[in-house]
Structures are given as structure tokens and as C-alpha cells.
Amino acid sequence: MKDAPEITPVRSAHRFDESALGAYLHSQRAEFSGPLKVQQFEGGQSNPTYHLTIGGKNYVLRKKPPGEILPSAHQVQREHRVMAALAETEVMVPKMYLFCDDPSIIGTDFFVMEMVEGRVTPDVTLPNFTSKERVALYDHFIEMLARLHRVDYQSVGLGEGFGRPGNYFERQISRWSKQYVFSKTEELETMERLMKWLPDNIPSGGETVVVHGDYRIGNTIIHPTEPRIVAILDWELSTLGHPLGDLAYCCMHYYNELENEKALTPLGIPTEKEFLARYCELMESEKIENWTFYIVYNLFRSAAIAQGVYKRGLDGNASSELAMTFGEKCKKYAEKACKMI
């Protein structure tokens, strides 16, 4: 199957006691019986992700990375909680099996979930799809975000201890500023400028919804043969927040890979204007104001995240060998954001 996720032997920095894991899993659920085989998925820059085969059946394990980590980052418990809460909604998520916060098992918190079969591609141009398939898939991609933003977070159990309504951007700007400072390896004037500009330019108002925090094509599983999403992954940045912050993040490709809008229509990929119009239609909302702020905020946030990945790469704790390229990504995002203010 094209675009199948790449599975590799477990990298040396991410090995753990597989026999301890096997014994623990066998003690927790009856279906976790039989020989255990552990491999690792390539990617997952933040939380190492493993392919488990137990008695001939496939599962996925997500854990915190080893070593010193950023404050409030790598929240696998949050990932597990939000996916479990969304199980009975229209948002497509894998089934959760268990969460473990006992470090004596494999050294860090982890959870085990369903292995959803399908295609995974980080390439937003979807090279292995036809133009007609891209039209359908992007429409479903936007629809999934709207479904998430329509979820009543109180009714699914995410009202207590999951996030705080209001002041979303104030809190997020403070958080990513602190994490950038924690992980920075050189002085960047662009990042200093953004950390001063953003708090002074936050738009007023806005409702509170469940936000994914990292919603993009590469964090979805696409049906093996059909142009539709069957699961959304990587929820560690999910919280209660502003819907337009989430929307702007999943439009980041218009400021990177898809900057040439003239090339999009023949491919079957919506322009940014069409993307936003479709979202507003699904949400039954009016025209979006102050769009530049939301884009600048997300470029800054992406820069801070990239710097964190780069720092982990320098420290030898990253989940992928690509981590060492993220230092330049941080600079690129920050420079692009500064040109917009």
C-alpha cells in the first residue's frame, strides 16, 4: 500500500525493557496475550511511537521521550484523555486500550491504542492521489476540524482539568515563549521581536472549543483506498482554546509548501480563501477578522516547536534523525512571521 507508515527497528536512544512491557500488558487485558514484538514508527518528532504485535494482532504504543524534556511538553496522558473522550463523537480517533503512569515499566508514561490501517503522508500535495481524490480528501479534512470544533467539551468530560476557557492566546504565547527560551541555542532577533509583538496584538473575543493543536494532513490516517480520513493522531497539544488558532495552524501549508496558489487548482487543492470559506460554511460562521494575527502566532509557535525538536536532536533524545534540520526551520518560520507584522 502506497503511503504506508514506515516501521523500523527500535532506535538505540528509544529502547526499553520489552519483557517488562510484555508482562505488564498481559496482566492488564486478556487480549494482550501471546508473544510481543516491538518496532518503531519513523517520525513522531515529539513522542516516540511504537508498533506492537501481540499474539499476531497489531497495536500502537506512544510514550514520552527519554532524557530531560521541556516543561509541560510530551503530554501523553493528555493525548490518551482527549482521544478517549472523543470516542463517542463524530471525530475520528483510534480506540484507546490503556494508559500507564508507572515509570518502573518502561521508564516513562505511555498508552496503547488501536492500530488503524490506512495511508499516512506528510506531503500536503498528496502526490499519490488524483485531482478528484484531493478535492474530496481536503473537503473531509476541513470537515473533521469543524466536527472537532462543534464538540460540546463539557458533555464529553473535558470541562475539568483539560484547559481553561478564555485568555487562550495570552497563555499560549507565554507558554511557547518560555519553551523557546528553555531550548534556544543561539540568539534570534526575530523571535525576540515576535515575543514582544504578539501579546500586544491579540484580537478580542472568541469562543472556546476543543482544539487539536497540530491538525495537518500528516497527522491523519487516510482510508486505504478511499479519499477520506479514518483517524486523527498526535493530540498532545490539544486543549480548550480558540478555534481560529487551530484553523490557522492547519493553513500553515499555504505559507510553506503551497505558497504558489496558482498551482493549487489543477491539483484539486483548495486555495486558502476557499479553505476558509468552506470552514466558515461548516461552522455557520461569518467572515474571519484579524487573520494575519492568527497566522503570525502560528508561525511563531511553529518556530518554538522546531527549536525544541532541534535541541532534542543536539541532546540525542529526538524521535527522528530529521531533528537536526529543525534549527533552520525555526529561523525560517520566525523570519516569515516578522515580514507580516
List each model region and its residues.
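Catalytic-loop of the protein kinase fold
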Residues: V210-H212, I217
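Hydrophobic residue at the +6 position relative to the catalytic HRD Asp in the kinase catalytic loop
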Residues: T220-I222
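Helical subdomain adjoining the active site within ATP-dependent kinase catalytic cores
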Residues: A304-I341
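All-alpha amphipathic helical-bundle segments outside canonical DNA-binding/catalytic cores
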Residues: G163-R164, E286-Y297
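ATP-binding pocket architecture of kinase catalytic cores
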Residues: P35-V210, P224-E226
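Juxta-kinase regulatory segment immediately upstream of eukaryotic protein kinase catalytic domains
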Residues: M1-F32
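Activation of the activation-loop gatekeeper triad in protein kinase-fold domains
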Residues: L233-S238
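Active-site activation/catalytic loop segments of kinase-like enzymes and analogous catalytic loops
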Residues: G245-E284, Y297-D315
